[in-house]
Amino acid sequence: MKFFIDTANLDQIREANDMGVLDGVTTNPSLMAKEGISGKDNCMRHYLAICEIVDGDVSAEVIATDYEGMIREGEELAALHPQIVVKVPCTAEGIKAIKYFSDKGIRTNCTLIFTVGQALLAAKAGASYVSPFVGRLDDIASDGIKLVENIVAMFGFYRYETEVLAASIRHTQHIIQCLEAGADVATCPLNAIKGLLKHPLTDSGLKAFLEDHRRVNEGK
């Protein structure tokens, strides 16, 4: 399973990339706003800065909600850098735009997926990725992980090449569950990725090793 980091914060992207396990980045308008980035030119420069840090795919979202606007913005984003994947919402206009982009060889990430039916339409339109939102479904007492499982099974049965990019990951357990569900990618906040390292037995074992090493050296 690939790891993407879900942020527009350059320091966090660098930290995750320095771990040597980062495969890509996902952003959205909310994450860009959180970093105080506004205006088309500033957003474009920021996407380029992200592409300079990582080697993998970088999802950049269109703001327009109409077909023509999505096409215009998506083509501009795709022309910015080869790593850019155009992020498009799962709406009627969005599915139409994904089909256009697919025909033009422009890669897309269909976002805001909450049903298998939405994922099916995105895959048929030629999306490179679909992003089921695990945490947001859990928030309304639905089962986000089950959705991931069902999409993975459906894509496998019908042999769609679209990758399942599990999004809205809230914690480390979500990552493990997405792995077990067969997701191709999990896009996560930095603290969730780092959380995979944590276990009390690892901490206590390392402490014991270091203490034994100290005693050996003192014995010399």
Curated annotation (Swiss-Prot):
GO terms for biological process: carbohydrate metabolic process; pentose-phosphate shunt. Its EC number is 2.2.1.2. GO terms for cellular component: cytoplasm. It is an enzyme of class 2 (transferase). One of its GO terms (molecular function) is aldehyde-lyase activity. The active site is at residue 87. The keyword Transferase applies. Pathway: Carbohydrate degradation; pentose phosphate pathway; D-glyceraldehyde 3-phosphate and beta-D-fructose 6-phosphate from D-ribose 5-phosphate and D-xylulose 5-phosphate (non-oxidative stage): step 2/3. The keyword Cytoplasm applies. It is found in: Cytoplasm. Coiled coil: none annotated. It catalyses: D-sedoheptulose 7-phosphate + D-glyceraldehyde 3-phosphate = D-erythrose 4-phosphate + beta-D-fructose 6-phosphate. Transaldolase is important for the balance of metabolites in the pentose-phosphate pathway. NCBIfam families: fsa_talC_mipB. Belongs to the transaldolase family. Type 3B subfamily. This is Probable transaldolase. The gene is tal.
